[in-house]
Curated annotation (Swiss-Prot):
Its EC number is 3.4.11.1, 3.4.11.10. One of its GO terms (biological process) is proteolysis. This is Probable cytosol aminopeptidase. The active site is at 274, 348. NCBIfam families: PRK00913.1-2 (NF002073), PRK00913.1-4 (NF002074). The gene is pepA. Keywords: Aminopeptidase, Cytoplasm, Hydrolase, Manganese, Metal-binding, Protease. One of its GO terms (molecular function) is metalloaminopeptidase activity. Binds 2 manganese ions per subunit. It catalyses: Release of an N-terminal amino acid, Xaa-|-Yaa-, in which Xaa is preferably Leu, but may be other amino acids including Pro although not Arg or Lys, and Yaa may be Pro. Amino acid amides and methyl esters are also readily hydrolyzed, but rates on arylamides are exceedingly low; Release of an N-terminal amino acid, preferentially leucine, but not glutamic or aspartic acids.
């Protein structure tokens, strides 16, 4: 889909239009102008009840090849973000069922609570791109697309530059979300740690601002990344740590922001085997790495003036004669020892060594992203990612970004008491904290490996993919993280 911004006299346009109608028979400014040209046709349709301001109500007026799509938008100044998404989805779905090839979108006049024109335009583009996403690379028969709609022009009388910036940001973010979804939806017989490394190398080939280094198991052994390697022991696919260095800060020596993603390309649980039901979805245990990859795609497109290092910690967790066992004690790269109580609590073992590894970059801050715990899904459901942090300022910055991006996150506590649940009789730490507060104790475990930099952890176990009829990766939290990075640009 092509997007642009235009300041135009709607009443003189012959292109198809989205026009807002509000409750209480209130016409938007654009509708009033157009109604004069149409000699009261819109007013008449509202009075007759053919269309109302109720959200989701649609009426299509036909004038030659032009389609004027009247869209019910609720109460002006009281429209919520969720309602606005429904409005955009309904309007675009209707347009695709017409002969329209280009739409001038005057729904920019809809006032969303606590949002501005920039957000209105950006969220519309992101919503449209999300709904356009289809993953059928492995289907022999592709879906037919009979829609002629190819371009949406955002109508605005002012703040033209703000709207154009919104389109630029939204298209880059949507591109990043798509990239994340594509590799997350890829089957595990294809998407393994080597595949993640290949994607990282290809990204470096496409962007002169990115340099990729891939670390294999031989080098990991030299570095003492024994916790990471233990998880990989049951798989024939070698673990790969893919490091994507994006450097575009005016000061090349400026400390980088590090994003580290858990990349379990398949997690059967190891010796602590998962139940068979829904195990196919454990291909999504690499969505943390996928989201980091998506973010790196987006910032390369935006050419943000920052130094950012994206790390994909690729690995598989499978049962095998060589697999690590409950009861094993592992010496991590940091020197801390960990008693394995459950081999299905593997993500924290991969991440703890990754978090130690990234110290070499002397980071300004580190954010890890992981489908880490089912406990987080129980606590927060599928709407909010879990946020844990040892740094209040960083946590607040992420919460602010989550709100701006409408990619929700909720901060969980991280007080010292939770460390008590991680005590082991035989090692420095246990890799499991017991039944209660599992999302928090997982974060508490990781915090032991982040003493040398500000750190935050996003648990996306509930938000990274959907089940049921809409099964598939969501691309979250790419929007949140790109927004966070946009906010870091001075």
């Amino acid at each position: 889909m092509k997007y642009s911004v235009k300041q135009t006299a709607l009443e003189q346009e012959n292109k198809s239009l989205f026009i807002a109608i509000f409750e209480n028979q209130e016409l938007s400014p654009a509708a009033l102008k157009l109604d004069l040209k149409l000699k009261g046709e819109i007013t008449e349709a509202v009075k007759n009840g053919e269309v109302s301001g109720k959200i989701g109500r649609i009426l299509v007026l036909r004038h030659g090849a032009q389609r004027i799509i009247l869209v019910g938008c609720g109460k002006q100044n009281e429209v919520t973000e969720r309602q606005y998404k429904q409005i955009i989805q309904k309007a675009v779905k209707t347009a695709k069922e017409t002969i329209a090839t280009t739409i001038i979108n005057a729904l920019t006049e809809v006032k969303i609570k606590d949002r501005d024109l920039y957000w209105n335009v950006r969220f519309a583009v992101e919503t449209i791109e999300e709904d356009n996403y289809i993953f059928e690379q492995f289907k022999s028969k592709k879906s037919e697309n009979n829609s002629k709609l190819a371009e949406i022009i955002f109508y605005t009388e002012e703040n033209h530059e703000q709207a154009e910036l919104a389109i630029r940001h939204a298209t880059a973010i949507s591109s990043g979300v798509k990239a994340a979804k594509d590799i997350a939806n890829c089957p595990p017989n294809i998407c393994n740690p080597a595949y993640l490394a290949e994607q990282a190398n290809q990204l470096a080939g496409r962007s002169s601002l990115i340099e990729t280094t891939v670390i294999g198991e031989k080098e990991m052994r030299k570095l003492g990344m024994n916790a990471y390697l233990a998880v990989s022991c049951g798989s024939k696919n070698e673990a790969k740590l893919s490091v994507m260095e994006y450097r575009n800060h005016e000061n090349p020596n400026a400390k980088p922001i590090v994003l580290a993603g858990k990349g379990l390309t398949f997690d059967a649980g190891g010796i602590s085997l998962k139940p068979a039901a829904d195990m196919d979805e454990m291909k999504y245990d690499m969505c943390g790495a996928a989201s980091v990859y998506g973010v790196m795609n987006a910032i390369a497109e935006l050419q943000l003036p920052l130094n950012v290092i994206g790390v994909m910690a690729g690995c598989e967790n499978l049962p095998d004669g060589n697999a690590y066992r409950p009861g094993d004690i592992l010496t991590t790269m940091s020197g801390l020892t960990v008693e394995v109580l459950n081999t299905d609590a593997e993500g924290r073992l991969v991440l703890c060594d990754t978090l130690t590894y990234v110290e070499r970059f002397e980071p300004e801050l580190v954010i890890d992203v992981a489908t880490l715990t089912g406990a987080c899904v129980v606590a927060l459901g599928q709407h909010n990612s879990g946020l844990v942090s040892t740094d209040d300022n960083l946590a607040q910055d992420l919460e602010r970004a989550a709100k701006l991006a409408n990619d929700k996150a909720w901060r969980l506590p991280l007080s010292e008491e939770y460390q008590e649940q991680l005590k082991s009789k035989f090692a420095d730490l246990a890799n499991l904290g017991g039944r209660w507060g599992g999302a928090i104790t997982a974060g508490a475990f990781l915090s032991n490996f982040t003493k040398n930099y500000p750190w935050a952890h996003l648990d996306i176990a509930g938000t990274a993919w959907l089940q049921g009829q809409n099964k598939g990766a969501t691309g979250r939290p790419v929007s949140l993280l790109v927004q966070f990075l946009l906010n870091q640009v001075k």
